[in-house]
């Protein structure tokens, strides 16, 4: 079995975010890392929408990311620390839209190791040096400079190693143009290591150490070190030189401290806490991330606590000495992994879990009544300030980036009866959790819908003048009339536009600079800017059946297949070409391309005929109306559309932006198929045809503009958009009802919209999330969803949600009541009334936990619910709250053989589980009966068990439960479940159970899979095979009777299969002593499974399912990852395909090595050597290679570049999208 890996949706969780001017213009951009992906985002300063400019897979783990700018430069570079053992400096090239590797210096081994640098990066604020550090011991400093040609150069590394030292954080200190300096949070563990009593370990202190790079001596010295009172978790650089006092802020538990050299005394200020917080009062508070904003006149920091509260931190200085730190509560946003304050006044928040946000900073919070806390205020040691959290006041949300991270569970099923299956994804954490329903398609925003007086058959938009940015008229054609609407604040009917209203319209367009043309069945109407009208009438009884128009040309087909060609002369007159062209059959459809910039005319006309052919006809004056080429079609054409697509933006000498792309002829057939063919711009030849089936209706094609490039809207029983995005073609359905006719639409409110008609309504639509594979509907949940099952009859979902360190609703209410009573009791006689009012206000206050976070209850505190949900409407039908410290871990829906048709839900619950050191007071299996057509849970009984029931699976009319490391068969009893049989020989802890026939495949938390056979006659569970590798299995899926696919905690996917000679018939041993099964092999079962395939995905996979994703497609193995990625593994159907892709992968490894310097083969073989899998993500980078490299690779494969990319597209569309 050979598989091909494809990513459908890249990881969405963000681990690092940096900002700067990466394209060299004044625009602010953000570079984010999503595990093994680098992405460049550009927030539009006018609309606030975030656009993705570039996404690159780096095939390595990005461990740190920094931006720097050389002194006097205008462009930021990116320095990346990864697991490749190399430091890499990247530059973004806007002309090619790619990251270019400028420098790659090797310094150590690959892999994420504790003493190989890469975990921490720090840059001197003036861009003169960069320090790259390991978690332990090693630190290297590289000096950055320019050569004579102003190119960036990098020195050889200077060492600043110190053995037995752990590093917690590193920053560059802003010292102006003095020798560059770096500050590190370190801890020396040498004494603690050598002291057997453990006393030294208890007294070990963290130190703040400054390293100075002496540029004169080219040497790094350890300048200064001092022990810290509290344990710091990160450092913030304070602007220095002429901008500020320099030094660092140390964020530690409960305090923030300012430190600098010389006579500067330490300034420390406690971190304020929420008033009346339900959190455990003993729990400390830390800052988790920060962002700095610096202008010429001032600077401030925004720092966020682990509850999500952002504080604005300012420093008061007196002659370069800091005198106090001031903190002011700013706003509360979800807890971030990284924050960036952009110069354009935006705050980008990359959330730890869930969606990411872009906020506009509306106020700086200087002049509001929020109290300001200062280090100068007198406080007892151990006391702190209190503030009241509130909804957003200084920030305004302007954009939200959908993120599925973390996906904890996923099932694929067509519960909504839509032909195409939906993905039901449980994601998020705590109160920000959600169940999301993903459908393949682009999200459509409806801008306006208006009723029309009848059912129109076509719609167009035209501009008044070629220089206009926006459209002026919408023209709607009916069976016997034409309606003209003007576009302004509102859309109104106009009568003086010059259009003929008493006839249907075939087409209309802007002609030349400022004239309009209307083609109707009896003639052509040319309307000048001063409302003069020229008409051309059809001869005799002939009428116009089809037409094609652009800015300078009009072609019409008369009845009988006669073509008449008009072209505009320099004076703005429409002139008919002297000859007419008779076609051999009736014309069904025609298309002209737009006139290329700087040219007089479009050279080609495409004509589709009844005889199932499409012909390209020249419009060049030298051979006008001469046929150039022809293509036979499998069915009759319905519509044609010539577009220029896939171009990269180029700037010419005058700075004019234009794009150089390829001409494509799109052909929509009457049988619902779309063909895309390359049209040669010189000869007019047609080549390289791609085919896609779109739906059951004939395909109509319309040209629209998306992100400044031409795109094609194709309408069949579903509407599809064909567009080029990041050097790849996308053909994506729109998640919207069926449309009949459309045209591009540009107005002030909606610069790149679509106007469309559907029955008797006119709709204005916008597509904002180009490049998105899925559109999603999210239903909020209360705690982190762990697993869910689908009830087969009602299609409802039964979800278990569990959170550690959390209170149940009942405990929360109880704690609040208790705190309110304490408030009243603590008050003196005269303050009683005031205290009572405060207590009442506190009880009534209800801040949404999805924004403000849930209170942290402490270790060993659990909260759980069981929810029954309708997945289509997303409404909760039933909710069962479990008691405090009961944690639901497993769920199953099953029927018992002795109870007939009733469905039961079993939920495995742990009681008082403490994770570290692990202890558990036992567990229960709750049994519920599904009543009321699967909408309500009726509690039957709970069965006590001695360990955590982490896996439940129905089995032959009974149920299998993994209780800790015991595998048991239970049956339903009146008062509880009855134990029928057990096996005690599983190694550690059962994390999953799959069943097929008499076989049970058990996943162990550390020891991979164990195959068990149930013998009915002797009522025994007997282990007959296991795996030879230890695998920390997270999820498994059965592929057939002998084969199982599994994933582990470290990001690997494997497929293991029992060899054909495996014997599970224990009864057949004639001697009766069952010797084979008792013998054992390699400390395990007597028979071993074989590994069919191994592959390192690079993200922890938490669900696997064998399914088909598109109607009529083939089966594939779909996986989802913790970081929000969705991918598939698809089998090759032929040897030659496998051979071809193996060679593509081999050539790309050498011709197009990964961006961060990691070896592709060793990345995919991180834990186990990669076996029988070809990496489609690498193969698809073929499309983004430079054309000459593409040519070299395809010549090695005896193909042309279009043939190679066609193969890549075909394998993708056969299984997915």
UniProtKB/Swiss-Prot annotation:
- The site annotation (Interaction with SF3B1) covers 988, 1171
Q: Which residues carry this modification: Phosphothreonine?
A: 1200
Name the GO terms of the biological process aspect.
mRNA splicing, via spliceosome; negative regulation of protein catabolic process; positive regulation of DNA-templated transcription; regulation of DNA repair; regulation of RNA splicing; RNA splicing; RNA splicing, via transesterification reactions; U2-type prespliceosome assembly
Region annotation Interaction with SF3B1 and SF3B5: residue ranges?
193-231, 786-804
The protein's site described by Interaction with SF3B5 is found at: 284, 306, 352, 429, 916
Q: Which GO terms describe its molecular function?
A: protein-containing complex binding; U2 snRNA binding
Which top-rank group of organisms is this from?
Eukaryota
Q: What SUPFAM superfamilies is this protein classified in? A: WD40 repeat-like
Identify the stretch(es) annotated as Interaction with PHF5A, SF3B1 and SF3B5.
Answer: 105-119, 145-168
Keyword Phosphoprotein found:
yes
Keywords recorded for this protein, A-Z: mRNA processing, mRNA splicing, Nucleus, Phosphoprotein, Spliceosome
What binding partners and quaternary form does the record give? Component of the 17S U2 SnRNP complex, a ribonucleoprotein complex that contains small nuclear RNA (snRNA) U2 and a number of specific proteins. Part of the SF3B subcomplex of the 17S U2 SnRNP complex. SF3B associates with the splicing subcomplex SF3A and a 12S RNA unit to form the U2 small nuclear ribonucleoproteins complex (U2 snRNP). Within the SF3B subcomplex, interacts directly with SF3B1 (via HEAT domain), SF3B5 and PHF5A. Identified in the spliceosome A complex; remains associated with the spliceosome throughout the splicing process. Component of the spliceosome B complex.
The record, for PANTHER family, names: DNA REPAIR/RNA PROCESSING CPSF FAMILY
This chain belongs to which protein, by name?
Answer: Splicing factor 3B subunit 3
Its source organism is Homo sapiens
| UniProt gene name | SF3B3
